[in-house]
Each structure stands twice: as C-alpha cells, then as structure tokens.
Amino acid sequence: MAAANAYPGYQPVRSRWVSRVPEHWSLLRAKNFLREIDDRTKTGEETLLSMRQHRGLVPHNDVSVKRIPPENLIGYKKARPDELVLNRMQAGNAMFFRNRLSGLVSPDYAVFRLLRDDCPEYLGYLFRSWSIRGLFRSESKGLGTGTSGFLRLYSDRFAALEIPLPTRPEQDQIVAYLRAQDAHIARLI
C-alpha cells in the first residue's frame, strides 16, 4: 500500500540521496546558509572539547584522563554555542554536531556558523541522518571504504552540496518530534 503524501505538492531534487521534497522548502547549497569559521586560540586556555559519536561535543576532561597542557592547544579552533562542528575525516560516520559549549576543537575540524535563522539542532540531526551520511561518504576523498580508511570531506565539496531546508517552524517541529522519539527510545532501553 502506498503512503499518502504529507504535503500538497513536491519538487524534484537533483540529488542522489533524496528524489523530492515539499515544494515550499528551500534548496540551498551549504555555503549559502553556513559559513566556515577559522578562529584560533592564541592561549590554549579555553576548554578542550572532544567529539563523541553518541554524545556530540563534550569537555575533554569529562571523557579522558589524559590532560593536555594549554601550550599544546595553541592554534586549535574556537567553537561557540550553536555553531556546527564537523570532523572532516568522519563525516560519513555522522561526526557532525551542534555545539552547546564554548571551547576548542581540533584544528582539522571544520566549524560552521549559521547565516540564516535555521535551527542548529535540526541541522545537526540532518547531517547525521543515514541519507546525508551516504552523501558525505560519496563526496569524501581519500583511501578506504566503509567506516575505516582515511576519507576526508573537503570544505569546497561540502559547500557545494545542495541541501533541502524546511521553514524554521518546521525545523523546530521536526526537532521536537525527534527529541520525543529519543526520549521514548531511552525509556525502553
């Protein structure tokens, strides 16, 4: 049995990962709604953040006993709340998160600031979805396959990706739904 359309009209998308989206959604290249930021620490005194698959960005000292002195962090990238952080070597493995804390991340990570009033949490969910992970993997360059290897999603390739974006109220509604589903699943575990 075919599923009913949730929206009155759809537009086709030139993409390998989705064939159509609601006609009122925007189709924007990533560079048109995100700007890559390269702001580096001069002191290394800020909190070092570590990226974890199931927790996102967390203080390094909360997940590791290895302490890193500030002088070793000079040149690391600054990340602020509501910016998005991408581990370029692990984009295809869903290592792309909304940042909730001020701190430092690896100089090899990409830090993005929103150019529009999009929901950063929605974008975090979107960029970790299975479809987008496949797209990121196909756009990455390097050696290896699957979850192993050295595949890097370069900034120019990410910037050129066409991403369908719902309106901000729809983004907020999707995030509320996903939070509720996450809470429901957590209760069952």
Predicted segment positions?
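Short amphipathic alpha-helical coupling segments at ligand-binding clamshell hinges
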Residues: 122-126, 177, 188
